Amino acid sequence: MVISLKNRNFLKLLDYTPAEIQHLIDLAIELKAAKKAGCEKQTLIGKNIALIFEKTSTRTRCAFEVAAFDQGAQVTYLGPSGSQIGHKESMKDTARVLGRMYDGIEYRGFGQHIVEELGEYAGVPVWNGLTDEFHPTQILADLMTMLEHAPGKTLPELSFAYLGDARNNMGNSLMVGAAKMGMDIRLIAPKSFWPDAALVAQCREIASVTGARITLTESVEDGVHGVDFLYTDVWVSMGEPKEAWAERVSLMTPYQVNQQVVNATGNPDVKFMHCLPAFHNEHTKVGREIEMAYGLKGLEVTEEVFESAGSMVFDEAENRMHTIKAVMVATLGD
């Protein structure tokens, strides 16, 4: 079956079929191999791409810029303070302006409705670099990384546990990705931090077709048993007030990924994943503040696990670029 994603938006995985998601992962694997072999074919020569960042970024910005440059495209970066978007000009108007000048637009910011509006009115492919609800490019990188570290297996044969704040964009997106690809996902969190019930129901409906297994539990021991991968994310997301830390640390400490949790999987080959940045020691400004306030040298993951041989976080980070490149090539490439 020939799959064409030409001129499609990439706003959330719910918009894509399992075959289309697998196609993007396979393309990313091919592009990664070609880059490393020095034989990458450029398909975005002469294309101009706008990168809208209403939230700061390291990995996402670098991944989009390097991917675009590798493929021969030019980029314009519009940072949090570098445009009139939402201040003097609506997103609907911005979309219609940028769509006349650019061949593709990336957006990283706040509500999902904003990137949906951008996608509706731009007239060119729009890609979601992160919203409060979803982070689809990260999930492509995660699924690619899982396949790389489970040779001979397909995604429906893999299981993973996500510990921590399961109601954030990563919890939402991992659940959607697992449902679409027929995987076994366990979301382990306090019940008040489970994903929205409507999204859970939607994912379970998808799972009834794909064979995915979706488990929501407060029990770490039950949830992690037998999984292939352990996944976590920060306990306080971008945009949440600093005052949320005290309550969050109290609620989430039992869900920290530490060696005890690794052992509880019963899988000597279990791998660790994190979308980054991670609070795993006191070597950052925030890390030092956390240590002083709560006496903790790591939050969602310990230094021991983060730096262990089973940690795939930097493979995962690299794969952000390859999967983002695949999205741009598939939707915009010649």
Curated annotation (Swiss-Prot):
Residues reported to bind carbamoyl phosphate: S57, T58, R59, T60, Q84, R108, H135, P136, T137, Q138, C275, L276, R320
SUPFAM superfamilies reported in the protein's UniProt record: Aspartate/ornithine carbamoyltransferase
Main subcellular localisation: cytoplasm
Any one Gene Ontology cellular component term annotated for this protein: cytoplasm
BP terms from Gene Ontology: arginine biosynthetic process via ornithine; arginine catabolic process to ornithine; citrulline biosynthetic process; L-arginine biosynthetic process
EC annotation from Swiss-Prot or TrEMBL: 2.1.3.3
KW Thylakoid (keyword) present: no
GO MF, one example: ornithine carbamoyltransferase activity
InterPro entries: Asp/Orn_carbamoyltranf_P-bd (IPR006132), Asp/Orn_carbamoylTrfase (IPR006130), Asp/Orn_carbamoylTrfase_sf (IPR036901), Asp_carbamoyltransf_Asp/Orn-bd (IPR006131), Orn/put_carbamltrans (IPR002292), OTCase_ArgI (IPR024904)
Lipid metabolism keyword on record: no
Pathway involvement of the protein, from the record: Amino-acid degradation; L-arginine degradation via ADI pathway; carbamoyl phosphate from L-arginine: step 2/2
Keywords (A to Z) from UniProt: Arginine metabolism, Cytoplasm, Transferase
Enzyme class of the recorded protein, top EC level: transferase
Reaction equations catalysed: carbamoyl phosphate + L-ornithine = L-citrulline + phosphate + H(+)
Function field: Reversibly catalyzes the transfer of the carbamoyl group from carbamoyl phosphate (CP) to the N(epsilon) atom of ornithine (ORN) to produce L-citrulline.
Family named by the database record: Belongs to the aspartate/ornithine carbamoyltransferase superfamily. OTCase family.
Protein name, entry field: Ornithine carbamoyltransferase, catabolic
Species annotation: Salmonella typhi
